[in-house]
Every structure is written in structure tokens, then in C-alpha cells.
Amino acid sequence: MHDSSWTEADILGVCSFLDIPKTKIDPLLQVDAFTSILIPLISKSKDYESIKNDRIVTEVNYEQQLRNSEKKLLQSNERYDLLEDERKLLENELSQIKEYLREKSSSYDTVLHDCSSLKSVNEALKQAQDQNLKQTAQLQNLLSDKEKEVEKKITIIKDLKDALASSTHQVLELQHTQQEKASLQTNYEFELQKLTQKNSILENNNTWLSRELQGVNDKLLSLHQEASLEKSQLSSQLSDAVLEKDALQRKVSSLSQQFTESNLRYQNIVAELSEMRKQYEFSQVSFEKEISSQKQISELWMEKCEDCSLRLKELQNSNGELEKLLEAAQSSFEEQLESHKEAEASLKSQINFLEKEVSSLESQLKLANERLRHYDEIEISDMSELKYSNLLNNSMKGFKGQSSVSDLYSERLYYKQKYEQTCQEVERLQRSYNHVMEEANLQHPLVKEQFKRFAHMQREIVAMSEQYQKSLEDCQKAKSRYEQLETLFKDKCTENKHYEQETKDLARQVQVLLHELDLCENGIVLGVDSRKKINSYVEKSLTEDETDTDQIISSRLVVFRNIRELQQQNQNLLSAVHELADRMEKDEKPDLDGAEIQEETLIKANETIDQLTKMLEEVSDQLRYSLKERDFFRSLVQENEKLLDMAPATPNSKLNTNLIEQTSYQRSLIRLEQLTNELESLKSISRNKEKKFEEAISSLQLEKSNIQLQLTSLTSERSLALEKLNDLEKSLVLSERSKDELDESYKSLQEQLASKKIEVQNVSSQLSICNSQLEQSNHIVDNLKSENLLLTSVKDKLKADLSNLESKLSSLQQDNFHMKAQIESSNQEYTATVDSMNSRILELSNDLRVANSKLSECSDDVRRLTLQNSFDLREHQTLVLQLQSNITELKQDITLQRTVRNQLEIQTTELKERLKFMEERQENLQSKLIAANKDTTQNPDNVEVEAISIELERTKEKLRMAELEKSNIQQKYLASEKTLEMMNETHEQFKHLVESEISTREEKITSLRSELLDLNKRVEVLKEEKESSSKELAKQLEDAVREKDSALSFKKDYEKIRSDADRVITSLKEDIEKERSLMKECHSNYESEIVSHGRTTQKLRDLRTEFDEVNTKYLKLKANFEQQHSGLSGAEKDWNIQRKAMEDEISSLKDYILGLENQNKLLHSQFDSLSQQITVLQQNSSENLNISANLEAVQDNDLRELVSYLRHEKEIMDNKYELTILDNRGLNQQVKSLQSTVDSLQLELNRLQSLPVSNDQTDTPIISGSQEVQLLYESNSVLRKDNDAKLGKIQELEKEVEKLNASLNPLQTEINELKAEIGAKTASLNLMKEYNSRWKLRFQSVLNKYERVDPTQLEELKKNCEALEKEKQELETKLQETAKETDTFKQQVNSLNEEVENLKKEVEQANTKNTRLAAAWNEKCENLKKSSLTRFAHLKQELTNKNKELTSKNAENEAMQKEIESLKDSNHQLQESASSDAEQITKEQFEQLKSEKERTEKELADSKNELEHLQSEAVDADGKTEISNLEKEIHELRSDKEGLVQQVQNLSAELAALREHSPTQGSLENADEIARLRSQLESTKQYYEKEKETEILAARSELVAEKEKTKEELENQLNEKSQRIKELEEQAQKNSSENTHDNIDDMIKQQVEEKLKENSANFDVKLKKVVAETEFRSKAKISVYEKKTRDLQNKITQLEETIENLNKQLSNPEKTDESTSSVTETKPVTSKPTASKADVGQNATEASSAKREPSGKSLSARLQGTGKQKGVQRPAVSRPVPMKPDSGKLSITGASKRIATSKNAAQNAKELSSTAKSGSLKRQRDDANKGGSSSNQKKAK
């Protein structure tokens, strides 16, 4: 029986112990005999498991401890080796530094010697400088006196100029008053002439009216009889007229509404502008405030930055001092170490030598003793003498040996004493080193704090800089916003002006339209006179503010009565634009030619300038040499005169003369010797100076070379130290690699343990085979006992090993303590050396400063020399530039005079041509006036003829004056050319001299600069070497400190590791116990899970079967759902299309019915009014043509030609006048420049002549030398400042580098630590993964054995089942919703069908009405055509006559041009002859000519204005009014006709759409409807093309009108400014005639030119603004029209897409049949013939497009765009013409069909194939399911 004393876990433990399965033990448990055996087995199994676990734990712990101890030993050994290597390196560096210091001391002595010599030189230079300063002070006093005199003269000149200006102002005012009087008189005369002309016209009109009244009275009698008959007709027509009046009133109200809307828009725009201005002002104020605040912030930041910079400088100074102290200490320490090492080495060598000698003496003594013993044994008798001799020798040798040993002993004592002394010195040095290290440690926290402060300040500076940059960015953004607002404001202003103009034009148009409506209502037909009166009334209605250009635009461009008038206006504008462009090109050609001529003259002038400069240089050289010779000869003459005075007055004149000659000769020789001696002394002084400078430079170079050698040695040492450091780093890397290898080996051992466990399991399985052999179990038990004994022995051994390890650890700790003590001692020594090195570095820095000061003094001297040379060069350059400017001005004057001459010649030719032309014109006018005005009593044109004759006389006088002026200018030109040649010669001489001096001085400067650069480079190299050495020492110090810190951290880490190891051991033991308990619980849970797993497998199988059933049901439901969904989607699409079409049709039909009713009323009323108007027009036209043709035909044409000709001449004269003004400006500028150059040259010559001659020539080199010294001294101060600033920057950068290095080191340490942690974690993760994978494999193997299912799969299957059930429920709800929606759709379709039937009835009624209207309309059209054709024939005849007249006039113009060319040639010949014979003309005569010319031009302008006014009055007197009225009526009829056609087309399209959607109608009706829809689409395209063309023409006309407005405004501005320029020129000329002073003339001319320049600049700016505004407006309008065309194109593309969709639907007739059958199940389906796909789609889309775009623009742009996109050719569109059909209904013919290319067909085929492929996949299941349903339906049919 089973006993309850053990558990299942005990049984499992026995099974694992015996390697027997539980199935075999379970039957044995029921046996009582087995229970007695099982109890001891359970206890043994438990013991076995505990021993096994303990063994594993001990092995793991032992291995870990061994590895840790080995690692620690390796690390300690490596660190010890590193410290020893560093100590050796420091000793080597100390020895090198000592040598370096010795060399520096020697160089320092040489530098001091050089300084003393330089000081003596500086004192001599200072004395010379003082003398120079005194001389400069005297010269400055003279200059000040002269300047005062000049200022007095300038004040006098200014007073004279003011008086002159006041007098000129008074003269100008008088002239102005005279001109105003003359203009008033001319205006009065002109108005009288106008009044006389008007009176004559009114008298003619009265006579004509009296004649017409008589004819009208006769007709009234006949009409009175007919009136009684027509009263009955008029009563019926009154009702129609009332209706027409209502329609017109509606139009008027619509126009007034538009006007009010435009006013509202204008007001809104004004309000928006005011708001924008307010916002702009507010934003401007806010921006100013922000800018001020940002400025304050920036100032605060700058102050903070300055404070920070001061603090930084303080920190840098403190850090520099610390570094210097450390370097001095280090250097001293290294020196001491080197001395001690040398002493130790020498002592060791001596000791070794002494030891060798002592050993050799001892060996000799041994040999002697042995020999004595040997000789004692030998017989004394035979060898007595020999023994005696041997003994003597041996004794002598011993004596010698004893003496050498004593000497050695004494030397040994002496060296021992020295050794002790050296040891004492070493101890003393160590104490000092320790003291220095303590001081460094004390100052270390202070240094750290300073570094922290420095870092903090740097962060603050960075933050401040970022804020400053942000503020700058904000300022820039604010500025950009401000600019954007300004541009917006300008745009709004321009838009505002544009809207104002539009409102004015609209008001004008509205007034004209209202007037014409009133006339039409009253039935009044206006004639020529009445139109003139209306125009005068319109002109009076304009405001006074509007200019003449605005009146012209409002009367000619804004107001129009027909489309023809608009087209004519546009054509006129285009022709005017082309003419203007041609004229601009012609006007620009002479400017380009003049520019090329000016360029050539400039090139020649430059060449002459170069020649003049060369001549000037040569002349200046000659002057210098001549001055020197003159001074020399003066000195000789003075000396000779003194000798003559001193000589006695003897009678022998010959003797006196000989004496005088001899004495003079001797004196001259003495003087020459003195001069030569002085030159030699100066040369010697200069040589000495140069030698001294060279010596100083050589000494500095030697110092530099020495320093470079020392630096190279230091760099080599540094490289060696770096190599050693690299080796140490490599050793550390190797140690880390060894650590990693050990970790890997540990992992491999763990894997081996796992593999061994697996092998143990295999062995246990093998043992299970031998379960039958129970007898062997006893032997196994014995073996186990023996194994337990072995385990106990192993435990004892492990304990012994642990004790040994602990002892080793203690020894290691002791070694560590010793190492720390050694490290501390080495640190103390290191600090001592650092202090000594710092002191030495300070000394060296002082030496370097002294050397730098010497170098700076030398560089100052060099700089002074360079500055003096540059000063001289600048003076020469100024002289050269002045000469060049003078020459250029002379050349400009010459060119100006040439251009003036050419212009005068051109003017004379033109005036002669005009004279001839005016004479001919006068003759023609007189002949015409005599022929035309025989019947008239008065002759108003005589005044004009007289004025023209006066003008001719004046022009002749002007020609004479111009020729005289031409000759005067030629003489001036010749004189100026001569002066130019002289100036060129002098300029060239001066240029040669200046270039020679400049070249010599530049060579000197280059040599001095090269020397200075070399010195600066040397100094920089020395600085860099010093900085590098200081950096290396600092790095070494930091490394030593780090090593100390690392040693301390190592100690702490070791203690932590030991404590952690103890903790880990305890925690591992606890974990082992916990794991044992967990294993037991897991085993029990595993058994229970196996049992539950069997149950779940059965449930899973059941669930799988259920899931398969549910899945099959789901697939069936899904297939049904997809079928129904596809059917529903198709039905929805069809229903939506039908609904939209029906709604559109309903709305369009309602609108159409209302429109038809209104149109019927309008047609009736218009028909009656047209009949009346035609009769009245026929009567009036017959009478008017006979009367007015004879009177006005001749006058109108002549006047028009005169006006056009005079306008053309006026424009030409204006352009020429502007060109002459520009040329005059250029000439004036050139004259001024030449005069200024002449004045400057004269001043220079006077200055050179008045220069005083210096007697003291000996002092000149000293003065120049002192000036050079002073200049060098001043320049050297600048270099010092720059040097100090650069040194500060270098120090700051060095500190930043050090900080970065300091921050990098801890980061690297942290990175290494993190890497180590990551490696440990990755290893632990890998172990856990392996452990997990093993457990999973084991679990799966168990499941596979027992054939059970995984619980994770079970959970996944459950989730899938739940999701499928949710989907099933959702599909059911969707099916219910779709069924409800289908019911609602069916109801809506039935209601729509009822509405369609009602609409059909209404359409039939509308068709009957349309047939009646069409018949009446056709009759009216035919009548109108006949009447209009007759009128047009008459007009064509008139046009042909006018064309003939034009051709004849063109021939006359050509003949006139030929005569003009011949006159030009003759005029040119006359000018050439007149240039030789003409005399000079005074300025007063020239001014008179100009004044007369201006008067004639004014009179011409007045006459032209009068002619233009007459022409504007005569233009409206033509017989165009009747034609315009007819055209207007025809246009209205056409518009009504097109409206009817559109309405009919809309109705037909709607009917087609209804028939298309109603499935009960026949196929023949569908074909007719498709044809109608095609025609309707083409008609809509044509209609929209026409509308687009009209809109484009209107836009173009608007743009042209705006351009003309701007052009006229600019022309007015130009005329005003040209008048102002003329006035200024007159003022300048009068002033020049009255004043004689040339300087005053120049001032006046300058003022005039400045004003002209300002006016021209302002005008150019305004021109640019106006042009930019016009361009902007035109671009904006073009963009608006482009947007409209794009919208139309997009709509067309949408329509075409809908057509394609309908084609696709029609391509599947079976599907359409099925969809229709589903909608209408009760109605039978009839067979349809297949219609064309494109026709059906077009019908559907045309109806929708006609409804969507009733008021849109033309469709031509859209059709073109779509054609380009899809490769469709543009169709040949023909206008639809309504015809009267046989059936009584309207039909449209002439509509062209769209011709599709092969490309379009291919593309459509590809699209259909792609859609078919995409739809075929969706419909495969539908086809399978529909097979059965379709067969059943066929059977039912």
C-alpha cells in the first residue's frame, strides 16, 4: 500500500536518482516490501541533490575569486611599471631644460649689448626730430595766415554773388509778367476767332433748318390724313410699348444696381485702406518700440559681455601665473634630479672599479701564500740562494700589494662620505619637493573654482550671444514685414485709383445709355447737329478736375453704342501703338550713334591725357634740376661778390681781375670739398646705422635659431613621451582583451558544464536500461558513499585554497600600500621640479619680452619710413589726378561744342524744310479756301494764313542767327583744342617724373616690408614654441594628478570589490536555497499542468471542428455580401446620376419657361417698334443723304488731314526739342569741367613759381630721417596694440582648448566604464536566453512525447473565433441597412418618374409656342436683311471713294518727301559755305533768336490745339449715327435669336436625358436624342467661344486705354518740365549777358544744371513708377483671364470624364438591362439597337454643362486644352443657323462633329482595358453566383 509519509516529489527524486521512469515505480509502491527499501532511497536521493548543488556553487565561486585576484595582480604590476617609466622621462627632461637655460643666458647678454647701442641711436634721432618739429611749427603759422586771407576773399565773393542773384530774380519776374501779358493777348484773339467761326456755322445751320421746316410742313399734311388710319394700329402697339418700357426700366434698374454695387465696393476699399493705414501706423509704432527695447537689451548684453571679458582676463592672468610657478618648480626639480643621477652614476662606476681592484688583489695574495707553502716543503740546502731571492721578490710584491690596498681604502672612505653628502642633498630636495606639492594642493581648489567660474561665464556669454542673434533676427523680420506692408499699401492705392477711374467711366456710360433709352422710348432719331449738342452736354457734365486726356478717353473710349464702335476703337489703338513703336525706334537710332561717337571721343581723350601726364612728368624733372642749378650758382655768385667787395681798389684792373678769378676759383674748390665731405659723412652715418640694424637682426636670428633648436629637442622629447603613453595604452587594451578572453573562457566552461549535464542525463537513460538488475543497486549505493567521502575531501581542499587566497590578498594589500607610498614620494619630487621649471620659464619670458620690445622698435622705424613714402606718393597722385580731371573736362567741353554744332546744323536744315513746306501749305490752303468759300461772306482762315506767314519770317531769322552761333562755336572749339594740346604736353612730362620717383620708393618699401615680415614671423614662431612647451608641461602635470587620483580610486574600488564579493557569496547561498524550494513547487505544478493539458487538447479538437464549420458559413456569407454590395454600389451610382440629372432638368425647365414667357412679350413689342423705326429711318435717310453729302464732304476730309498732319509735326518737334535740351546739358557740363581743370592748373603753376628756395641744403637729409623716425614710431604703437590684442586672443583660445581636454578625459573614462557594464549585461542576457531556450526545448520534448497541445496556440484560436463572430454580426447589420436603403431608393425613383412625365407635357406645350414665334421671327429677319444690304452697298461705295483720295494724298506726300531731301542737301551745302564767311554773333543776338523761336513754337502749339478742337467737333458730324443704330438693333435681334436657340437646345437636351434614363422608351428615340445632344454641345462651344473673344477684346481695349492715359499724363509732365527748363535757360542766358565775371557765370550755370538734374531724376522716378503700375495692372488682368480660362478647361475635362463614364456604362448593355430591370421590375423590357457610346455620354454631359455654366466664359479655351492633353484635333466649328423645319419644331443645322484621331482612340482603348481588368477581378464571384439567377430570369421571360 501507498504510504502517506512521502510525497510525489520524493518519488520523483528517487526516479531521478535511480534513472528509472515513474511508470515502473508506481506499481511497486503498492507492494509492502518495496516501501521498506524506498524510505532509505528517498533520504539518499535528497542528500545526493544537496551535495550536487553545493559542489556546483563552490566551483563557481572558486573560479570567480581566482579570476578577480589575477586581474588585480596584473593591474598593480602594470601601474608600477608605468610609474617607473614616467620617473625616468622626467629626469631626462630636467637635464635638457638645464642646457636650454644656459644657452638662453648667453643670448640674453648679447641682446643687452644691442639694446645699449640702439638707445644711443634713438637719442640722436630724437634730437633731429626736435629740430624738425620747430620747422614744422613755423610752416604751420605761415599756412594759418594765408588761410585767413583766403577766407576774407571768399566772403567778399559770396556777397557779390548774393547781390547778383537778387538782381537776376527781379529781371526774371519782369520777364514773366511780360510773357503773361503776351499770352493773354493771344488767348483773347484766339477766342474771338472761335466765336466768329461758331457764328458762321450757326447761320448755315439756321438756313438749313428753314429749308427742312418747309419740307416737313408739306409732309405733315399728308401724314395727318394717314394718322387717322394708323391710330387704331398705335392703340394696339401702345400696350407692347409699355411692356418694352418696363423691360428697359428693368435694365436701367440693373445698371443702377451695378453702379451702386461699384460704389459700395469703392467705399469698402476706402475703408479697408483706412484700416490698413491704421494698422500700418500701429505696426510702425510697435516696431519702433520693439527696436528701441531690443537696442536697450543689446546694450545691456554688451555691458555684460565687457564685464565677462574683464573677468576672463583676470582668470587668465591668474592661470598664467600658476602655470609659470608650476613650470619653474618642474624645471628646478628636473635639474636637481639630473645632477643627482649623474653623481650616483659616477659613484657607482667608481665603486665597481674599486671592487674589481680589491678582488684582483685578493687573488694575488692567495697565489703568494700558496707559493710560500710550496717553497717550505722543498729542501733548503740545495736551493738556498734561489729561495732567498724568491722570498725577497715575494716580500717586495706583498709590500707593493699592501700599499695599493691602503690607498684604495682611503679612497673608499672618501667616496663614502661623498655618497652620504649626496644622500643628504637628495633628502633636502625631496623635502623641498614635498613642500611645493603641498602648496600646489592648497591652491588646487582655488584654481578649480576659477575654472568653474570661467566655464560659467562662457556659458552666459554663449546664451547672451544667442539672445542677441534672436533679437537681430526679430529685427530683420520686422523690417521685412514693414516692407511688405509698404508694398501692400502702394498696391491698394493703385487699386483705389483704378476703381475710381472705373466708377467715373461707368457713370459716363450709364448717362449715355439712359439718354439713348429715353430717345428710343420717345421714338426720336437724332441727326448730326443733335449729336453735336449731346456731346457738348456730355462735356459740360464732366468735372473741372479732369484734364483734356480724361475728356478724350471718356468721349472716345469709354462711351460706345455698338460692338462695331468698340472694334474700331481697338483697331485705332493698335495702329497708334505700332506707330509709336516705330517712332521710338527711329528716335533711339541717333542716340545710339551719338553714344558711339562719345565713346570714340572718350578713348581719344584718354590717350591725350596719358600723353599730357608724360609731358608733365618730364617738365617737373627739368624744373627740379634747373632749380638745383640755380641755387648752386646763386651761392657761388654771392661768395664772389663778397670777395670783390673785400679786394682793394688798385689801378691795375688786370691784376684785380686775376685775383678775383683765382679767389673765386679757390672758393669754389673749397665749397666743393666741403660738400663732398658732408656727403661722405652722411653716407658713413647711414652705413653705420645699417650695420647696426644688420647686427641686431643677425643677433635676433641667432637667438631664434637657438630657440628653434631647443624647441626641436623639446618636441622630440615630447614625441618620445607620447610614444610611451601610447605603449601604455596599448598594454591597457591588451589587459582588457585578456579580461574579455577570460570571460569567454568562463562562458565556455559553463557551456561545458551544461553539455556534461546533458551527458549525465544520457548516462541516466542508459542506466534505466539496467533496472532489471536490482542486485547491482547495492554496489551503486556503496559507490555513492565513496563519492560522498570524496566530496567531503574536496570541500576540505577548497577551504584550504580559500585560506591561501586570503593570505595572498593580504600580501597584495601590503604591496599596494608600499606602491602608494612610492607614488606619493614621486609626486612630491615632481612638484619640486615643476616649481623650479616655472621660475626658469618666468625668467625666459622676461627675456623674450625684452627681445620683442627691441623688435617692435625696429618695426616702428620701418613703419615710419613706409608712411613717409606713402605720404609722398599720395601727394604726387593727387597732382596727377587733378591734371587728369582738368584734361577730361576740356575734352568734354570739346565734345559738347561739337554736338552743339551738329545740332544747330540739324535745326537749320529742319527749319528750312519747314519753311518750304509751310509756303507750299499756305498756297494750297489759299487756293482751297478761295474755291470753297465763294458763297460765304466771311473768311475765318485768313487769320491763320497771316499767322503762318509771320511764323515763316521768324523761322528765317532764326536760321540766320543759328548760322552765326555755329561760326562762334567753331572758333571756341579751335581755341580749346590748342589749350588741350598744351596741357597734354605738360601732363606727360610731369607723369614721367612721378613714375620714376614712385618706382624707386616702392622698391625701398618692398625691401623694408619683407624684412619686417621676416621679423614678425620669427616672433610668432617663438611664441608658438613657448606656448607648445607650456602646454606640454601642463599636460604632464595633469597626467600625474590623474594617476594619483586613479591610485586612490583603485584602493577604494578594491575595498568595494571585497565587500561586494562577501555579499555575493551570502546572496548566492540564499538564492540556492530559494531555487531548491522553487524547483519543488515547479515540479508539482508541472504535473498538474500535464493533466489539465490533456483535457484542453480534447476541447481544442472540438473547437477546430466547430471553427471549420463557422469558416465555411462565413465564406458563403461573405460571397453573398460582396455580390449584394457590388449590385448596391452600381444602383447607387445610377440613382445618384439620375437624381442629379432630374433635379437639374426641373430647375432648368422652370427657368426656361419663365424666360420664354418674357421673350415672347419682348418679341411682340420689338416687332412693332422695329416696323415703326424702319419707316422713319427710310424717310430720314433719303432726305439727309441728299442735303448733307454736298456740304460736309469737302470740309471734313480736309480738316482731318490738316489736323493729323499738324499733330504729327508737333510730336516730331517735341522730340527734337527734348534732344536739344539733353545735348545742351552735356555741353554745359563739359565746359565746366574744362574750366575747372584750367583753373586748377593755373593755381598749381602759380604755387610752383611762388615756392621759396631753401638755403640750408645740408639739413634736408637729417629732416627727412627725423620724419621717417617719427612715422615709424607712430606706426609701431599701432602694431603693439594689435600684438597685445592677438596675444589676449591666443591665451583665451589656449584656455578653451585646455578646458575641452579636461572635459574629454572624464567622458572617456565614463565611456569605458559603460562599455564594460554593457559587456557584462550582454553576457548575462546571452546566458539567460540560452537557459530559456533549453527549458523551452525540454518542455516541447515532453509535450511531443505525450502528444499534447501548446496553450499559446489555444489562446490564439480562441481569439480568432471571437473575431469571426464579431465580423459575422457586423455583416448581418450591414445587410439589413442595405435592404432599407434599396426600399427608399425605389420610392424616390417612382416619384421622379412621375415628375418627368409632367415635365414632358410642359415641354410639348412650349414647342408649339416656339414654332409660332420662329415663323414670325424668320419673316422679320428677311425684311431686315434686305434693308441692311442696301445700306451697306451705299457705305461701301463711300469707302472706295475715300480710299482713292487717300492713295492720291499718299502720292503727294511722297513727292513732298523727295523735295525735302533735296532741300536738306542744298541746306548742307549752304552751311559749309556759311561756315567760312559767317561772322561772330554775340550772346544777346543768340538769346533774341531763342526767344523768337519759343514764341513761334507757342503760336504753333496754339494753332494745333485749335485744329484738334475743330477736328473733335467735326468727327461726330459724320453719318455714322444711323449705321450705328441699325447695327445695334441687329445685334439685339441676334442676341434674342441666340437666346431662343439656347433655350430650345436646353429643352432638347433635357428631353434626351429623360429619354435616356427612362428604360420603357424605344431605341429610335434615343438615337434622335443623341444627335440633338451632339448638336447642342457644339452650339454651346461656339457660343462660349464668341463670348470669350468679346471678353478678350474688351480686356485689351481696357488695357490700351489705361496705357494711353498713363502715356498722356507722362507727356504732360514732360511738357511742363521742358517749359521749366526753358525758363531756367533763359535766366542763365540773361545773367551771362548782364554779368561780366566768368566765376559768376559758372555759379549760375551750376545752379541751373543742378535743378535740371533734380527735375530729370524726379521725372525718371515717376516714369518708372507709372510704367511699373501699368505693367502690374496688365499682369493682374491677364492672370484673372487666365484663371477663368483654366476654370473653363477644368470644367470641360470634368464633362469629358463624365462622357467617358457614360460610354463605359453603355458599352455593357447587359449590365444596363439588369440595372433597369432591378429598378422597374413590373414594366416589360423591349429590345434596343446599340447606339454609339460617345453620343450617349455627350448628351448627358451637354445637358449638365449647359445648366452649370449659363453665364460662363467661352468654351474654346477648354476644348483646346483638352484637345492638347488627349491628342484630339480642334473641330471646324460652324455657327448654328435656325431654320424653319417641316414638322413645325425647331431644328439646328450646321453643327460640326468632333473628329477624334487615332491617338485618342488608342488612349481610350487602353483606359477601357485597364478599367476592365480592375473590374474583372471583382466580378468573378458575381458571375458565378449570377449564373443561376440569370437562367431563371430567362425562363421566366
UniProtKB/Swiss-Prot annotation:
The record's annotation in Pfam families points to:
Nucleoprot-TPR, TPR_MLP1_2
Q: Name its cellular compartments.
A: Cytoplasm; Nucleus
Query: Which is one Gene Ontology cellular component term of this protein?
Result: nuclear periphery
Q: Where is the composition biased (Polar residues)?
A: 1468-1479, 1700-1730, 1753-1763, 1795-1814, 1827-1837
**UniProt keyword terms in alphabetical order:** Coiled coil, Cytoplasm, Nucleus, Phosphoprotein, Transport
Q: Spell out which residues are annotated as carrying Phosphothreonine.
A: 650, 1560
One of the record's GO molecular function terms: structural constituent of nuclear pore
Phosphoserine occurs at 1558, 1563
Q: Which residues form a coiled coil?
A: 59-378, 415-519, 559-625, 661-1163, 1222-1637, 1675-1712
**Top-level taxonomic group:** Eukaryota
Query: What's the stated role of this polypeptide?
Result: Functions as a component of the nuclear pore complex (NPC). NPC components, collectively referred to as nucleoporins (NUPs), can play the role of both NPC structural components and of docking or interaction partners for transiently associated nuclear transport factors. Active directional transport is assured by both, a Phe-Gly (FG) repeat affinity gradient for these transport factors across the NPC and a transport cofactor concentration gradient across the nuclear envelope.
Q: What is this protein called?
A: Nucleoporin nup211
| The organism of origin for this protein | Schizosaccharomyces pombe (strain 972 / ATCC 24843)
